[in-house]
């Protein structure tokens, strides 16, 4: 796969943003209830793509797999920047 020197645009629908946020919250709580470190497990999943980082408990694994990992990363970056006073257009 070749790479280009051109900047590529990536866009995520506003409705998906809200659903990803709700899904991450639900997955976080499921991981916490099972005694895992939710942050470590979510990071493991996002970096590797291995769904084994997220348990089937409360259907958490199926919920998080509804979204591409790049969509999850985009929502996490957006949330972080907005929380630090950056005006996201």
Curated annotation (Swiss-Prot):
UniProt cross-references to Pfam families, sorted A to Z: IreB (PF06135)
Domain of life (superkingdom): Bacteria
InterPro entries: IreB
HAMAP family: UPF0297 (MF_01507)
PANTHER family linked to this entry: UPF0297 PROTEIN YRZL
Family, as annotated: Belongs to the UPF0297 family.
Protein name: UPF0297 protein Sez_1866
Phylogenetic lineage: Bacteria, Bacillati, Bacillota, Bacilli, Lactobacillales
């Amino acid at each position: 796969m070749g790479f280009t020197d051109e900047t590529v645009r990536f866009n995520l629908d506003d409705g998906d943003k809200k659903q990803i946020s709700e899904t991450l919250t639900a997955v976080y709580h499921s991981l916490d209830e099972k005694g895992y470190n939710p942050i470590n497990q979510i990071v493991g999943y996002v970096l590797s793509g291995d769904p084994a980082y997220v348990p089937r408990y409360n259907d958490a694994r199926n919920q998080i797999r509804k979204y591409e990992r790049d969509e999850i990363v985009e929502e996490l970056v957006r949330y972080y920047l907005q929380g630090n006073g950056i005006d996201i257009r």
